[in-house]
Amino acid sequence: MWNRRRNQALDGLDDEIRDHIERETEINIARGMSPDEARRQARIAFGSVALVHEDARAAWSWSWVEQAGQDLRFGARILKNSPGLSVTAAVLIALVVGINTTIFSMVNALVTQPAPGVKPEGLVRIAIPERPGAPLVNYSDYLDYREQTTALQSLTAFTNSRVTVASDSGSYAMWTAPVDANFFDTVGVRPVRGRAFTAAEGRSTDTAGLVAVVSYRAWQDVFGGDEDVVGRSIAINSRPATVIGVAPPSFSGTMLNERTDVWLPLLMYLGTLSRETSQRSMTDRNDTPVDVIGRLAPGKSIAAAQADFATMQARLDRSYPTADRPRVAVVQYAATAGGLIPSGAPTLLAIFSVITLMTVVIVSANVANLMLSRAVARQRETAVRQSLGASRIRIVRLLLAEGLSISVVAWLAACLLTIWAARAIPRLLPDSPFGQAGIDFGPDWKVVVYAMVLAAIGTIAFSLAPALRVWRQDALPWLKAGEHSVAPGRSRLSNGLVVLQLAFSVVLLTLAGLATRSVSLMTVDLGFDSQNLLLLTARITGSVTTRESSLALIDRIQERLQVIPGVHRVSYVRSFFPTTQMVRTAGAAEALRATMHVVGPGYFPTMGLSPVAGRPLTIADRERAGAVAMINQNLANALWPGQNPLGKTMSLRMLTFRGESDEQVERVEVVGVTPNAFVGGFNPERPDPRPNLIFISEQRAFGGPGRDPAAPGEITFYLRHGDSDLESVASALGPVLREVDPRVAIVSTQTMDTRLDNVTFSARVIARLLLIFSLISLLIAAIGQYAVIAFNMRRRVREFGVRIALGASARQVLSTVLREAFGLTAVGLLVGLLLSVGVAFAIRGALFGVTPTDGPTYAGVFALLGCVALMACCVPALAATRVNPVQALRQE
């Protein structure tokens, strides 16, 4: 409607202009002028009709909108008229934006994505900054926070544990989340069948009324999707329980890397533990840390909640001054996949930020060269536009419109590439932590905006070079110049862009080389044969009520596994995750940290380890009056340097995240020394990756809270098998365990090699991504170098023709072109070397076994870049030697 009114007004303006000119013409005729002269003088007196139209249009409409539309239509026509260059530029931009957006999408999913099914608005988490990754507050403090808070409308606690769930279909090892009764209301989840926990169930410690909410996946897999699942009886760690609800299919817990299958009331779960553990958990303010999340009250902010918790903490500090109570922080809830993000996440994010910046700069520089070439080809057209009155700003806007048109196409293609990659990553890495966590890497609004920002940066970057050239351009010389005239400034700018691409390619190649070298050096000698070693982790419950029945069950399982065809040796480790002990000797000033493994009979032969001193642990050690252990050479040398450790005694005390535990000190005699071996896997993030190790067996003399062999727990059996027996052995494990005791549940089966590979998974992924980025960047830089050399060669056709006509040989012409090309390469290498050293020193904390100035890495980078530069220069250099002097001299 606005356009129609404006057009009507402009039509009325035309009528008024004609009427004004007609009246002025009549006046001039009355003065004695001829009709033609009278009309001419009237038009002269009125002025430019077109200018009046433009002024009126500017006053009556949004002229900048119309001009922007004209610029965009012009840019679209340019795309259509030169599809080759436009498609090339769009593909390059789409590739770099798509890859970088995919990485950002992964980081976004891992760091900021809420767990599926959770209502994230107003949800906060209570965190402890100085203890990242550790459980948060003790249960007693949580109860006080829940009752006293004024900034949160609800506060709930949860933890996690693995349990054995037995139903009519069998026994299953599942992750359970013991939660407070208001957990589901706080996170905004409603069961699709049945109900959640009541307040009475949340307060009860009576395990006779144990109830459970199961996940949708467990409902389908364990109960076969039974419509009458609510009310069914199951057994959780051999205790009867009743299913009261089924969670929605989208909800499997509050953390991305934790797939919870069973939720239990927290106090009821504590009641299933020993009386001592249960009592300590509910009253000791230095025990039982739990995770705490809450929902802000209406009108309250995170800052208000932080102030509220500071007040409550000060009150608790006065009431319970001896409690270990770290400062807490109220932060926005995010289902961070803690197990998937390495401890050096800030360094890794910084590395990826550098990668993103460099790839965008490399591609933008390459596309800028393409756009600059097109601008040079249209230099006379631009000069004509300037001579006809077009301002420099208007011409620069046209160039920006061309770049924007390319970027819009590239942005759409990049979004499609990101969507495809987000769906492909879990399928391409099904056995990786990323694939197993079930994380949705699909783009959200933040990813889309990120892609738009990258595309906008690229638009400005690659449009800037031709725009600067136009801004400095004088129209008159170009109107007089010939078709092949090119100002020296163009060559300098193009050469500078090539140097920039080469320098950043050197940086990326160096990072990739250092990362690859780090990963290769992580493949150290483990000290034992990891091949043909199958790990079976199982939960033992049911008849495990006494120490004797526990050991009898383990022995029966070991005996049955031993007779599986293809199995050569079998042993076990009591816990898949070993404990950390503080070790002291008589007269020692400081304690040493060591990792302790509780192992079964035959462990060392199964692992292929022989004692270097003393004897191995045997089944007879179970009933000894005093505890005995084997230690590795590393710990023996640290405790008793230059002495014989056999027969000596050491004191052990367990180390927790709060420090040394208050448990009794265990005194253990050393009966053997083992070779140094990474039996728990190689950890490259450990400052001293070669650990101190202690091995003990199932011994009555080694007691203490939490070490009761009768307690339900997990056992990892180590099966040494033949070269071709893996599949047959793995398929026999389930039937064997069911035969021994149907209540024994399999937690996992994996080869030792797979377990070891998972340790370096993040490092290998980073190295591969860096390698891919660097090779793509090098290819783009080589294309850019080829384009510049080829352009310069075409510009100097007359020069080469004159040289050949005057007797220059093909070798001399070839050396001239190659000298120019390798001059660019040398400058790019020098600049890249300086940048690489600086970046390498900045990330040296993420490197393993290599220095930031690693010689083989830099030598390989220089050799690779030199070969690529040579290939990029050969075609235009050889073309220069085949110039026909006669044809070259006839050109304008």
How would you name each of these model-derived features?
Residues 42-85, 116-117, 129, 170-171, ...:
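Membrane-helix entry/capping segments
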Residues 83-110, 362-365, 407-411, 494-518, ...:
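Short, strongly hydrophobic transmembrane alpha-helices
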Residues 106, 368, 403-475, 514-517, ...:
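Small-residue-rich transmembrane alpha-helices
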Residues 162, 175-200, 209-350, 423-427, ...:
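Mid-to-C-terminal secondary-structure elements
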